[in-house]
């Protein structure tokens, strides 16, 4: 019987549903149980692996070499490890069984739901027809009653007046006919509904319901079959008696049974086999009794009155020991013949045939035999001694015992001889003179005791210990000496040349010697020949060397002190002190052979030497006393040296420059170079002079000189350097060409004679190392000069006709009146900004509006020469106003950066205020200022013409209108105060125009619309938004009083910002996360492109993420990266325009062409992807979504990386907004577990991409959910190799899937490997 015939009732149907629910619950219970068993098996496998690893940890395994036990144990542990791996494999298979059970449960739920729906459907059809029959029957009864009533009325009227025809009769007749017609129709419908119900009920009972039940029975039986197979797999993987376990156990039994006790030590014996030991020969030394008179004989006991008692006692002890040994032997023999079971070695079994630890009978017999032999040996040894003593005593017999002592004379003589020999031996032991003297000196203490601790006791307390000792013997000249930080204060050790005398201290009066001593170890010396005595003092490493000078050292002659300024320049710029020795050597040469002209001028300073006697023998009990005394001497000598130094030079003497040091050139040759040279000559002279003094004075004076120059610009402007004639402005092209040589000449040369003389002096007097130091000093001077000139607004200097070309210039003294100058400049600039938008009276054109950069700056930046009559210049007024005076050319001021900037020269002119007050047009023409602004895309001169009140273009064509640009992009574009742009936003499904300004932050102002349709902020309304923006821009009035934001610089659209009207959408070719993807065409170039659109309903956060892909792609250019053409943000919808790759998605391409792909093509795809990812890695870009679905293929099978929606331009990215929409099966474990993304995470994804390519589009981790795949990956599971995959490529996949991110290869290595494999494959074919 089946479901079709037995379960047609309603109760049976409900019971079938309940049974299916119970089966589903049972499946859930089974799944949980199998999961728990798999978990337990995994834990057991881990524990068993730990047991095997612990068993294999054998200390000194080489000592067990050749041991069968050790070999068997290792095999046993290896089999345990195999058993653990088998348990782990079975546990993993049980997890797969759980997955199958889960899928079966899901399919069963779907089948249950389908059965319920189908049963309800056919039952509802029958119920509907049943209800229809009932309804038709009630209608039939109703119409029948109406028919009967009207028929009665009609008959009554017709019978009463059959010949009359009237209106009333006609009405009755019509109603009667209608009732009759309704009755007949209802009758027919009722009959049809009954017939249909009969057929439906018959089919429901005989066909539909039995068929449904039969199908349900078939489905359930198929589920039961699958269920049984799943249970069989679970039982199979949980069977401990399986063949694999039996094989493991069999191998364990085999290796244990192979242990043969007789062969255990065979190899060990062969390895350490030696020949039998030779017997030791014990003989009496005859030399012991040669010099002893008496009766002592070798190997013979002496029996006399002195030893007889001891021999008898010894005999008794030995006889007792012999008896004890004999008794023990008797007892042992009795036990062997018949005793206790334990003694006999019988085995006590514990219910089995295996021993519980008691030795076998054979082992017991061996042990007893060994003990018996030992007792017999002891007995024999003691018996030998007994026989020897008895023999000696028997020889004496009953005779009188001989005397053991000689007469008194002999005894006394022996004592004397012994005493003499002992004394002689003692004298010989102390005959070594060197050792005795050293011991005596060490005992008494003194110089050697101090010398032993010289490295510790004779160091200055305030100086650190040297890290490594320096070699005292130096080869070559003094420039090979290395600087050290150890010093001995200001002392130098000298000796008197007349004869030996104690070492004395002398103050170092030479300044350079003092510097050398302060930075070198005292052990460094300069090697000199014996014929030429050294002129430099020898610097000792420790004071111990001072106390122990040799007797043959030459006297030391101190060099004469040199002026302080001759050495300081190099000292300030170099920590190496080789120049000190160089200067000393050169001074020595100068002193020894001076020129005739200089002999009369040279004044030899007096040498003042303080010679202080120091005892050569230090106190024996105090070394600190010596150190305290040395510190005291150092302090005295330091004070004396300070008093002997020359007074410092006057700092104020450098305040003014000499007349012949400052020269100006003619403007026709190089006005810019002349300007910079004249403006910086004073400070440059001071800097070069300043380097010739001490460091402290240098710093103080440089600060003072800078503050002098900063102090008063007003007095500075009154100098002759400013009051010069005016010339016309040279064209910008000539200024740009003269800028480069001017700057080069300014940085390389110098007009200061002091600096030149200093350089020549350094070149003549210093060695190679010192020359580099001098150059460094010169570079420092240049840096100081450039820093000073950067902060000063200088004026243009020309060669006047009424003044001489040689100027007398003096730096003004410190004053604080520069605020008025700044206020004057500010007022001029404000007037210029307010008046510059007025049209010219002659040509009706407007004056030039200066954006962030002038044409002069753009010409320099792009190295383009501006033609004389350019189109851009025709847009502005070039008419010279009447009575215009010559304008001073601008000054190039070198700043901290490489790019120069311009500054107006009219601010400091005496006549500039008067010119502005009298004539507005002259002010406009003379104030062609260029303001320093950001290098971003501010309005260029071509755009400046459009920023006017006469524009008729629509708003979306304005360069400063950015369309529906998100606020985050606005924040990125607006960087400086005054930057502004206009954009559109959608709020509450209503479009609004917003003005965004950077002013103490980023502020956004919604353009208000009046009732008349005009636009305004807080000021007057305007007819168009352009006019409103122009008014705010030219008037420089705040947008709102509260914000105070002023419009200064419009920010243009970037070059990749396209208009939506430039793109024509053709057909939809796909769908992305943010919207549809279309094939489109550009109107301008007729180029086919791909366009990604963003749905208008998405929030701003999603739109920002959508535009992020465009921002990343716009800066990349690589053949394996999809190229960005532009972004359309002028209006909705936002679009990203990219190149169209005709091959489409790589995943679709792999699945469609799975049969035609070759291994060479697949490896080429892998190489293309590696090349693109290598490029991204070099740009610090993390893709985060690398997969076959996000790669494109062109017609030449070349792969391009696409879909940068999740990309980040960082070396390391930490996810902070959750792990939603993360492709789990393509993501590295560290990113899933910790949210940490690096380029090595893309390497993991690249391995999955390779697997997709070689599997020809299969889904990774097929049959596993995301969570299940993640668990398997964490446990070490890796996907198997796809079919026909080269072994090297799969090995590369496994390297990309390394659990440790640092162990994965980088994309550069991956590309090289894949490229090498392709090359090898090509060569093989």
Curated annotation (Swiss-Prot):
Ranges of Acidic residues composition bias in the record: 907-927
GO cellular component, one term: adherens junction
Name this protein carries in UniProt: Tyrosine-protein kinase Fer
Biased composition (Basic and acidic residues): 659-675
Residues bearing PTM Phosphotyrosine: 1213
Ranges annotated as biased composition (Low complexity): 676-685, 749-780
Entry annotation: catalytic residues: 1185
Function description: Tyrosine-protein kinase which is required during embryogenesis for formation of the actin cable in leading edge cells of the dorsal epidermis and for the timely progression of dorsal closure. May play a role in regulation of adherens junctions and cell adhesion through phosphorylation of the beta-catenin arm.
Molecular function (Gene Ontology), one example: non-membrane spanning protein tyrosine kinase activity
Pfam family of the protein (one): SH2
Annotated stretches, region: Disordered: 453-506, 586-605, 659-700, 735-780, 875-928
UniProt similarity note: Belongs to the protein kinase superfamily. Tyr protein kinase family. Fes/fps subfamily.
Lineage: Eukaryota, Metazoa, Ecdysozoa, Arthropoda, Hexapoda
Keyword field: ATP-binding, Cell junction, Coiled coil, Developmental protein, Kinase, Membrane, Nucleotide-binding, Phosphoprotein, SH2 domain, Transferase, Tyrosine-protein kinase
Originating species: Drosophila melanogaster (Fruit fly)
Deleted gene: phenotype: 53% of mutants die during embryogenesis with the remainder dying during larval and pupal development. In embryos the rate of dorsal closure is reduced and complete closure is delayed until after stage 16. During dorsal closure, filopodia are normal but the actomyosin cable is reduced and the leading edge cells have an irregular morphology. After dorsal closure, a very small percentage of embryos display a small anterior hole in their cuticle. Reduced phosphorylation of arm.
CDD domains for the chain: F-BAR_Fes_Fer, PTKc_Fes_like, SH2_Fps_family
UniProt catalytic activity: L-tyrosyl-[protein] + ATP = O-phospho-L-tyrosyl-[protein] + ADP + H(+)
Organism domain of life: Eukaryota
Record's bilayer topology term: Peripheral membrane protein
Boundaries of every F-BAR domain copy: 1-264
Localisation per UniProt entry: Membrane; Cell junction, Adherens junction
Residue ranges, compositional bias (Basic residues): 453-462
Keyword GTP-binding included in the entry's annotation: no
InterPro entries linked: AH/BAR_dom_sf (IPR027267), F_BAR (IPR031160), FCH_dom (IPR001060), Fes/Fps/Fer_SH2 (IPR035849), Kinase-like_dom_sf (IPR011009), Non-receptor_tyrosine_kinases (IPR050198), Prot_kinase_dom (IPR000719), Protein_kinase_ATP_BS (IPR017441)
